């Protein structure tokens, strides 16, 4: 049996991490959670992540900065941004231009998040397939 997709959640809000983790596990995904971008970058299995759910604003490195770092390091991890500041059109545009799969406002709609994760996983499989060819 194949391993379930691995979803990594990076958010400084513990309640968000716990609720997203619970939702993802309830539909059969493996989940890892991190309180900061730095914690995620120091994780030994970063490359195993199939989808990254990432808060935009966090103390230390922001979600946008983490996205830039991953791009510069040639990590092709599909990213879903989540934020309590959805009205920041400039940040939203930058995130999507840089390849984010979705940009969702908190409080999160479970349906919207699950749809975004499915889209991210489809995109990720396409990226992996093209590398193999």
Enumerate the predicted regions with their spans.
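Hydrophobic/aromatic residues positioned on beta-strands within the core alpha/beta folds
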Residues: 82-83
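Acidic catalytic/metal-coordinating carboxylates
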Residues: 35-36, 62-66
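The C-terminal output helix
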Residues: 118-133
């Amino acid at each position: 049996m194949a391993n379930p997709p691995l979803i990594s959640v990076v958010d400084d809000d513990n309640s968000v991490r716990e609720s997203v983790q619970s939702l993802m596990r309830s539909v059969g995904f493996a989940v890892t959670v991190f309180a900061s971008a730095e914690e995620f970058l120091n994780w030994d299995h970063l490359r195993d992540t199939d989808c990254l759910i990432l808060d935009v604003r966090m103390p230390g490195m922001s979600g946008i900065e983490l996205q830039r770092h991953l791009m510069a390091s040639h990590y092709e991890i599909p990213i879903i941004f989540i934020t309590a500041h959805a009205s920041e059109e400039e940040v939203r545009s930058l995130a999507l231009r840089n390849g984010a799969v979705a940009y969702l406002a908190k409080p999160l709609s479970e349906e919207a998040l699950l749809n975004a994760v499915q889209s991210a996983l489809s995109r990720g499989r396409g990226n992996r397939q093209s590398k193999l060819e």
